[in-house]
Amino acid sequence: MAALSAPGLCGFRILGLRSSVGTAVQARGVHQSVATDGPSSTQPALPKARAVAPKPSSRGEYVVAKLDDLVNWARRSSLWPMTFGLACCAVEMMHMAAPRYDMDRFGVVFRASPRQSDVMIVAGTLTNKMAPALRKVYDQMPEPRYVVSMGSCANGGGYYHYSYSVVRGCDRIVPVDIYIPGCPPTAEALLYGILQLQRKIKRERRLQIWYRR
């Protein structure tokens, strides 16, 4: 009896295996039919619409980059500051212009007119009554223009921070590029600030930004 039941059991197993194989083949066919709707290795995907403008040619980028380097070299090598001495920091600014440090060797030449200047050195305490004059002189400077805040009083009010008549930082009136700490900062510190401004100008990419628009 046991010998007779073994072939029947094998038949049931074979039928069950066939049914499972048939179900797997049907499921595979369903998955293949769904997958063929989208892109596959044999069916290339359609290119998507680009929302960003195409990049310019490498030759144009190279020419504009070299022009930027040339303009930045000329600009940082001939900084003409507009002196705006307000307090004791101006004495150290004059010290930097003396023969000991000789700022002329860096191309820094003081100008008396804002029309001929591209840098303003705010040296000293800025009061509320002086703030409109500072802004007026800044507006008369041609673009591009830079501002150097020299000393603690120009940076944030300094010793007179809580005074009713003092502006707590000249960056509330004009945009500042370089801050020089100290009360007062030495001539070496101001010279270092000028060198940092030259490094900042060297990294500018004005023409490249204009070219990519």
Swiss-Prot record:
Protein origin, superkingdom: Eukaryota
Binding positions ([4Fe-4S] cluster): C88, C89, C153, C183
UniProt GO MF annotations: 4 iron, 4 sulfur cluster binding; metal ion binding; NADH dehydrogenase (ubiquinone) activity; quinone binding
Cofactor note text: Binds 1 [4Fe-4S] cluster.
An annotated GO cellular component: mitochondrial inner membrane
Localization terms from the record: Mitochondrion inner membrane
Cysteine-cysteine disulfides: none
Alphabetically ordered keywords of this record: 4Fe-4S, Electron transport, Hydroxylation, Iron, Iron-sulfur, Membrane, Metal-binding, Mitochondrion, Mitochondrion inner membrane, NAD, Oxidoreductase, Respiratory chain, Transit peptide, Translocase, Transport, Ubiquinone
Cofactor(s) required, per the database record: [4Fe-4S] cluster
Residue span of the annotated presequence: 1-38
SUPFAM superfamilies for the chain: HydA/Nqo6-like
Listed Polar residues bias regions: 33-44
GO biological-process terms attached to the record: aerobic respiration; electron transport coupled proton transport; mitochondrial electron transport, NADH to ubiquinone; mitochondrial respiratory chain complex I assembly
PTM comment, free text: Hydroxylated ar Arg-111 by NDUFAF5 early in the pathway of assembly of complex I, before the formation of the juncture between peripheral and membrane arms.
A Pfam family matched in the record: Oxidored_q6
Catalytic activity: a ubiquinone + NADH + 5 H(+)(in) = a ubiquinol + NAD(+) + 4 H(+)(out)
Disordered as annotated region, ranges: 32-53
Membrane topology recorded in Swiss-Prot or TrEMBL: Peripheral membrane protein
Post-translational modification Hydroxyarginine, affected residues: R111
Physiological role: Core subunit of the mitochondrial membrane respiratory chain NADH dehydrogenase (Complex I) which catalyzes electron transfer from NADH through the respiratory chain, using ubiquinone as an electron acceptor. Essential for the catalytic activity of complex I.
Quaternary context: Core subunit of respiratory chain NADH dehydrogenase (Complex I) which is composed of 45 different subunits. This is a component of the iron-sulfur (IP) fragment of the enzyme.
Family, per entry: Belongs to the complex I 20 kDa subunit family.
Entry protein name: NADH dehydrogenase [ubiquinone] iron-sulfur protein 7, mitochondrial
Lineage: Eukaryota, Metazoa, Chordata, Craniata, Vertebrata
Gene: NDUFS7
